[in-house]
């Protein structure tokens, strides 16, 4: 299982059976990984649901071009190779600019894909999020794109600012697309 998609349809679950073959998931768009592919893979027997079933999973802690190869051999053993995509990556190593391979986080749950999501959320909150920011209230941001899309004008902006003030939003954002209109 891997997650892919497009704008507005991010993180669509794609289940692909792992036979005696290789499955290659990669991003080499010269940009960060995005909705098209995420550096993540999950393995189950094919019967896991959102609430039940064993799921083994791994996430590459890397936001750039990546490659994950899932391979099953004749004996049924599964191997995962994950890291920076070798397609177009060139890294000159020096004493001043060493390279540290990104971490690949592995996990297991017997509680299906939902259990996997909950475990990953807790792990990110407990270990990745800087603890000095973990419990700090975040500002409420009001973005003009969602209520008005391309229909941005002075009247709508004033109405939006008034609504934002009523709900306690601190910043009001007018997106670059809106500015061009």
Model-derived segments and spans:
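N-terminal accessory beta-strand-rich subdomains and adjacent acidic, glycine-rich linkers
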Residues: 1-124
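Proline-rich intrinsically disordered, low-complexity coils
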Residues: 17, 39, 98, 102, ...
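Residues at structural and domain junctions
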Residues: 82, 128, 143-146
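Long, charged amphipathic helices and adjacent flexible linkers at domain junctions
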Residues: 121-135
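Aromatic-lined carbohydrate-binding/catalytic grooves of carbohydrate-active enzymes
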Residues: 133-181
């Amino acid at each position: 299982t891997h997650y892919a998609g497009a704008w507005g349809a991010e993180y669509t679950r794609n289940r692909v059976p792992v036979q005696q073959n290789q499955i290659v998931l990669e991003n080499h768009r010269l940009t960060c990984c995005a909705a098209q592919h995420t550096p993540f893979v999950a393995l189950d027997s094919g019967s896991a649901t959102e609430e039940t079933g064993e799921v083994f999973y791994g996430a590459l802690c890397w936001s750039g071009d990546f490659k994950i190869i899932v391979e099953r051999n004749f004996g049924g053993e599964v191997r995962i190779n994950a890291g920076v995509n070798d397609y177009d990556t060139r890294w000159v190593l020096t004493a001043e600019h060493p390279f540290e391979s990104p971490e690949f986080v592995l996990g297991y749950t017997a509680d299906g894909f939902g259990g996997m999501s909950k475990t990953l959320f807790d792990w990110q909150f407990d270990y990745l999020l800087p603890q000095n920011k973990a419990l700090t209230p975040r500002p409420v941001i009001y973005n003009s794109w969602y209520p008005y899309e391309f229909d941005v004008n002075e009247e709508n902006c004033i109405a939006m600012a008034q609504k934002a003030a009523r709900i306690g939003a601190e910043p009001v954002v007018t997106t670059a697309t809106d500015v061009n209109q």
